[in-house]
């Protein structure tokens, strides 16, 4: 399935998913430092593996995906399949509505 097939995302639900599944390793706060994973502020429209000051794996640098709804939807299903060799240990979100909700939150929170 694709992002176009997903139900409309709910940013409030996405915020809860981010807090439960992502916030241990990522922040969305402008100007905040990186954690275990890169700061996701400004991620939409950015090329993967390019957040200044974060030490990416070679696989993350080589992928060069431009982050938007479609690429994030595919990536969040199975990060290790989307970018083999990524350092991200997250297994992924299997439910389309969870991915759509998280993307809606990220789009609002990282702009």
From Swiss-Prot:
An annotated Gene Ontology molecular function: metal ion binding
Keywords: Acetylation, Electron transport, Heme, Iron, Metal-binding, Methylation, Mitochondrion, Respiratory chain, Transport
Entry-annotated residues carrying N6,N6,N6-trimethyllysine: 80
Residue sites binding heme c per the record: 22, 25-26, 88
Statement: the UniProt record of this protein carries the keyword Heme: yes
Keyword Acetylation (UniProt): yes
SUPFAM superfamilies: Cytochrome c
Places the protein is found: Mitochondrion intermembrane space
GO cellular component: mitochondrial intermembrane space
Modified residues (N-acetylserine): 1
Highest taxon, organism lineage: Eukaryota
Chief place where the protein resides: mitochondrion
Modification after translation (UniProt): Binds 1 heme c group covalently per subunit.
PANTHER family according to UniProt: CYTOCHROME C
Family affiliation: Belongs to the cytochrome c family.
Record's function text: Electron carrier protein. The oxidized form of the cytochrome c heme group can accept an electron from the heme group of the cytochrome c1 subunit of cytochrome reductase. Cytochrome c then transfers this electron to the cytochrome oxidase complex, the final protein carrier in the mitochondrial electron-transport chain.
Descriptive protein name: Cytochrome c
Source organism: Ulva intestinalis (Hollow green nori)
Lineage, opening ranks: Eukaryota, Viridiplantae, Chlorophyta, Ulvophyceae, OUU clade
């Amino acid at each position: 399935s694709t992002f176009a097939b997903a139900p409309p995302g709910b940013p409030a639900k996405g915020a809860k998913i981010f807090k439960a599944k992502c916030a241990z390793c990522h922040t969305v706060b402008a100007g905040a430092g990186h954690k275990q994973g890169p700061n996701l502020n400004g991620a939409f429209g950015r090329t993967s593996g390019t957040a200044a000051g974060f030490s990416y794996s070679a696989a993350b640098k080589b992928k060069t995906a431009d982050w938007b709804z479609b690429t994030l939807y595919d990536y969040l299903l199975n990060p290790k399949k989307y970018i083999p060799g990524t350092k991200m240990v997250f297994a992924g979100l299997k439910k389309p509505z969870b991915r759509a909700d998280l993307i809606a939150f990220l789009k609002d929170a990282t702009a």
